[in-house]
Amino acid sequence: MNNIIDGKALANEILADLKLEIQELISQTNASPKLAIVLVGDNPASIIYVRNKIKNAHKIGIYTLLVNLSTTIHTNDLISKINELNLDNKISGIIVQLPLPSSIDKNKILSAVSPSKDIDGFHPLNVGYLHSGISQNFIPCTALGCLAVIKKYEPNLTGKNVVIIGRSNIVGKPLSALLLKENCSVTICHSKTHNLSSITSKTDIVVAAIGSPLKLTAEYFNPESIVIDVGINRISGNKIIGDVDFENVQSKVKYITPVPGGIGPMTIAFLLKNTVKAFKDSLYTLDK
């Protein structure tokens, strides 16, 4: 049953287009996009994510700067480091790898990144732009990746019923705003929702971003369900599984993303797409 969505293949298509676009920009401007990644500490999972971002960036011609800092750094000192990156005209985009140590004020750090370099889309100004509908500057990359996958397999979303399980600022909330703009009827559920399966089993599209390994079994879906599994749960060392019981659900739904190989590669692709956007926006600002 060929209903498994290959997120890696879709991401590679985006990266191939970005590579050509970057080559054209270099020929026109003699400059390249540059991504700064701020990593605090040596969390093994964070290190793997950062390496993947750097590897994919280099493949398409984006330079990277890794700023690796000690877990003992104070919030104000980290803000000072981010301000240095904000003022560096050679830096197109900045990401702060999450999670941060509990001693650091995450909200202050995310707010310190210049909105024009906030390619993660976490700055309050960019969040406000998205939810107000006034404009869309930078949007969280996982939400963009989910929307791209959904539209690939369901191009006309008008009137579709979507359940998002998860209310985070990274996935649930921004994706709900994007889907509302596509004229979907969106229901947001979470870990405290009662009778969850009675809600999800009647809907067209289910996005699982609850952070609970293999929680969603076959009873949560119907044969026409499109299932987007955003969960990344590490078990038994380096093994990664999603929020959906993939082995038992896959044959009982219309389409499903695997973990790994589903939304993860799409998130990185849109992170780099946002980096190129930031670079182009900076060129426009310099020309004014």
UniProtKB/Swiss-Prot annotation:
Entry keyword set: Amino-acid biosynthesis, Histidine biosynthesis, Hydrolase, Methionine biosynthesis, Multifunctional enzyme, NADP, One-carbon metabolism, Oxidoreductase, Purine biosynthesis
Instruction: Copy the pathway line from the protein's UniProt record.
Output: One-carbon metabolism; tetrahydrofolate interconversion
Gene Ontology terms: biological process: L-histidine biosynthetic process; methionine biosynthetic process; purine nucleotide biosynthetic process; tetrahydrofolate interconversion
PROSITE patterns, per the entry: THF_DHG_CYH_1, THF_DHG_CYH_2
Supply one GO CC term from the record: cytosol
Q: Does the keyword Acetylation apply?
A: no
Q: Which residues bind NADP(+)?
A: G166, R167, S168, S191, I232
The EC code for this enzyme is 1.5.1.5, 3.5.4.9
Q: Which SUPFAM superfamilies match?
A: Aminoacid dehydrogenase-like, N-terminal domain, NAD(P)-binding Rossmann-fold domains
Question: What would be an example GO MF term here?
Answer: methenyltetrahydrofolate cyclohydrolase activity
Q: Which Gene3D superfamilies match?
A: Leucine Dehydrogenase, chain A, domain 1 (3.40.50.10860), NAD(P)-binding Rossmann-like Domain (3.40.50.720)
Please give the catalytic activity noted in the UniProt record: (6R)-5,10-methylene-5,6,7,8-tetrahydrofolate + NADP(+) = (6R)-5,10-methenyltetrahydrofolate + NADPH; (6R)-5,10-methenyltetrahydrofolate + H2O = (6R)-10-formyltetrahydrofolate + H(+)
* Assigned protein family: Belongs to the tetrahydrofolate dehydrogenase/cyclohydrolase family.
| Record text on subunit structure and interactions | Homodimer.
User: What PANTHER family does its record include?
Assistant: C-1-TETRAHYDROFOLATE SYNTHASE, CYTOPLASMIC, C-1-TETRAHYDROFOLATE SYNTHASE, CYTOPLASMIC-RELATED
Q: What is the purpose of this protein?
A: Catalyzes the oxidation of 5,10-methylenetetrahydrofolate to 5,10-methenyltetrahydrofolate and then the hydrolysis of 5,10-methenyltetrahydrofolate to 10-formyltetrahydrofolate.
Which protein is depicted? Bifunctional protein FolD
Q: Which organism is it from?
A: Rickettsia massiliae (strain Mtu5)
